[in-house]
Structures are given as structure tokens and as C-alpha cells.
């Protein structure tokens, strides 16, 4: 069988052995080697997909790169990857732990880009505050996990009834209350308010927002000083000029205005 996995440079998929192996950030991986072998990388949004070849078992990508700076796919990049995977017989995996469950304005971010992955990974918001992870794929793929060996033997807490109930109810509320659609209106409000000379760019897809500052130090001061004023922001892993804004989908317009007021007051003090 095939063992080669293709991931993207500056990707982040987690901190456990397998997910760290496919993350594209060497300085965070160095202390934990040896990791999984036969991992190769492509540039996100690059047209050269030759690394995906007949030895490739799967390609794993974030639909929107998070730690790299909230980088959205351009020029039909995901469609090209999907077609390349189909050509060589590899599976396309999309990691939507950050982008899924309504955050980008659709239930799943891949819906913006006219493709469907072979395997979809979910977590974080799916549990509504409870720890949960999910792998979603078609039945024929799941059937492959029924033998040699059966997948079920490797999980201690898999399918926990309380967490499964929390996940079901969270998904139901997101769909019933149309929270995905409402994120676009809230995104527009953020972008309308967050105008300042120290902000060079606002990257956003729904309520997945990154403020790109003039330099690392400005970003660092904004996060720390905002926390002192009661507002939680955060950094991104690789893009040090960026400040993350990823509030709950239920955030109100008045809360958005209050938060933006704090951000602008901090920037005025820098």
C-alpha cells in the first residue's frame, strides 16, 4: 500500500504524534523527532502539484490556513488539488477544526470553493465546549477500517454519549438559528469598525478574522494591552504580525462594538 502523505508548508494540524508529523513547521517538530516518515510538502496556493504522485496515499490541508495567517485558497487551488488527487488515486483530507461549523459563513468552509473532500476532519466548536473530534467520510472508506485491524480497538473515549449529545445539540443549534449566515453580517461590522493606520490589512472569512499589523511588536502589544482591558485576542503561530479575532458565533453587535473600541483605544496608545 501507499504511505506517502502530502501536507502544506506552514500548516498546523495538532500536537499529537500523527498530527504533528504532517504539520509544516519544523521548529515546533524538532524536539519530538523521529515522527512519521514519508511526509512531503507543497506550497499553499501553488500551481505546482507534482509532489502529489502515484505513491501518495493522501493529501491533508486546512481549507483556510490558520497559523500561517488566515490564508484563503486562491485561483481554484482546492479544485486543482482535488483533481490531482483523483488523477493519481489519492484521498483529499480537509482539516476544518477551525473553519468548520459556521465560522466562515457556511456550515463548512469548503462549500465556498465548490469542492468536497474525501475525508473531513472536525473538532473544537463541534462539542460546544466539550472535547470532541470527528472524521467524516463515505461508507466505503469507513468499511476499510473494519478489519486488519478494526479501528474500534484504538479509542478509549470515542463515542462518549455525553459528548456525542453535546455535539448533536451544538450542530442542531447552529443550523436551526442560521448562525452561519449571521457571521457575514458580523464580519462586515468588524471590518467597518477596525480601521486604523497601524492595521495594514484585515483578512477575514466570516468570524475568522486576522488583523495584520505593521510589525511583530505592534501585534504583541495589542494582544497584551487588550487583555489588560478585558478583551481576549491571540497571536497566530507563524505570522507574527497577525492578531487573531475568532469570537463565538453568538457574539452580539454591541459586544463587537465594545471589543473594537478597546482595540482602537489600545492602538491609539501605541
What are these regions (language model features)?
Residues 1-270:
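Conserved N-terminal phosphate-binding loop of PLP-dependent enzymes in the Aspartate aminotransferase
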Amino acid at each position: 500500500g501507499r504511505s506517502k502523505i502530502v501536507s502544506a508548508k506552514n500548516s498546523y494540524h495538532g500536537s499529537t504524534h500523527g498530527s504533528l508529523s504532517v504539520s509544516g513547521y519544523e521548529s515546533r517538530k524538532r524536539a519530538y523527532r523521529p515522527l512519521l516518515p514519508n511526509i512531503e510538502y507543497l506550497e499553499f496556493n501553488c500551481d505546482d502539484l507534482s509532489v502529489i504522485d502515484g505513491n501518495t496515499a493522501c493529501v491533508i490541508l486546512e481549507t483556510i490556513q490558520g497559523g500561517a495567517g488566515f490564508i484563503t485558497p486562491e485561483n481554484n487551488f482546492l479544485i486543482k488539488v482535488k483533481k490531482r488527487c483523483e488523477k493519481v488515486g489519492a484521498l483529499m483530507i480537509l482539516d476544518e477544526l477551525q473553519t468548520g461549523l459556521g465560522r466562515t459563513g457556511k456550515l463548512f468552509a469548503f462549500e465556498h470553493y465548490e469542492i468536497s473532500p474525501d475525508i473531513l476532519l472536525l473538532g473544537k466548536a463541534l462539542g460546544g465546549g466539550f472535547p470532541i473530534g470527528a472524521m467524516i467520510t463515505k461508507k466505503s472508506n469507513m468499511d476499510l477500517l473494519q478489519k486488519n485491524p478494526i479501528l474500534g480497538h484504538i479509542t478509549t473515549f470515542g463515542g462518549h454519549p455525553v459528548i456525542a449529545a453535546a455535539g448533536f445539540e451544538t450542530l442542531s443549534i447552529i443550523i436551526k438559528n442560521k448562525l452561519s449566515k449571521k457571521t457575514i453580517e458580523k464580519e462586515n461590522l468588524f471590518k467597518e469598525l477596525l480601521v486604523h493606520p497601524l492595521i495594514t490589512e484585515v483578512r477575514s472569512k466570516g468570524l475568522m478574522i486576522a488583523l495584520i499589523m505593521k510589525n511583530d511588536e505592534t501585534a504583541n502589544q495589542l494582544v497584551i494591552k487588550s487583555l489588560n482591558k478585558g478583551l481576549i485576542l491571540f497571536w497566530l503561530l507563524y505570522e507574527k504580525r497577525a492578531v487573531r479575532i475568532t469570537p463565538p458565533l453568538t457574539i452580539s453587535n454591541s459586544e463587537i462594538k465594545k471589543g473594537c473600541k478597546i482595540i482602537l483605544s489600545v492602538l491609539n496608545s501605541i
